[in-house]
Amino acid sequence: MSRRRVIGQAEILREPKFGNLDVAKFMNVVMLSGKKSIAESIVYGAFEAIQNKTGKDPIEIFSQALSNVKPMVEVKSRRVGGANYQVPVEVRPQRRAALAMRWIREAAKKRGEKSMAQRLANELVEASEGRGAAMKRRDEVHRMAEAHKAFSHFRF
């Protein structure tokens, strides 16, 4: 590990339409091969579909979905005396949001709807209501942490 100065986090510009930093980060998560305009059209298309489907503010739905999917604890492998233990650890806030965004994207990719914007819209609506594949993933991670609670004294 380097002993030199710590490198700062890259600044993410707010997206122009809503001025929301989380939406800008989510666009970067959706983006493939640097094609940001395509990622923007997917996310904005999903927001439009959410607006049409629910009649509510898409930013509210998005932030509700994000906060529902964010994991509180996860398990990390720790080797102690020749045995590997799955140790539950609390997730840092930045990683919490990153994991939630990734899980929503992956869940949307696996859905059956025609366009990615439609898949993303439906996944976001379901996640905001506490359903969907992304929520299932979060619950699975929480279950793993709960099952391995006995090893929590092997802190990092």
Curated annotation (Swiss-Prot):
Q: Does the keyword S-adenosyl-L-methionine apply?
A: no
Task: Write down the SUPFAM superfamilies for this protein, in alphabetical order.
Answer: Ribosomal protein S7 (SSF47973)
An annotated Gene Ontology molecular function: tRNA binding
Q: Which UniProt keywords apply?
A: Ribonucleoprotein, Ribosomal protein, RNA-binding, rRNA-binding, tRNA-binding
Q: Which Pfam families match?
A: Ribosomal_S7
A GO cellular-component term linked to this record: small ribosomal subunit
Q: Which GO terms describe its biological process?
A: translation
Q: Record keywords: rRNA-binding included?
A: yes
Which family, according to the similarity comment? Answer: Belongs to the universal ribosomal protein uS7 family.
Q: What does this protein do?
A: One of the primary rRNA binding proteins, it binds directly to 16S rRNA where it nucleates assembly of the head domain of the 30S subunit. Is located at the subunit interface close to the decoding center, probably blocks exit of the E-site tRNA.
Quaternary structure (record): Part of the 30S ribosomal subunit. Contacts proteins S9 and S11.
Protein name per Swiss-Prot or TrEMBL: Small ribosomal subunit protein uS7
Q: Source species, please?
A: Thiomonas delicata
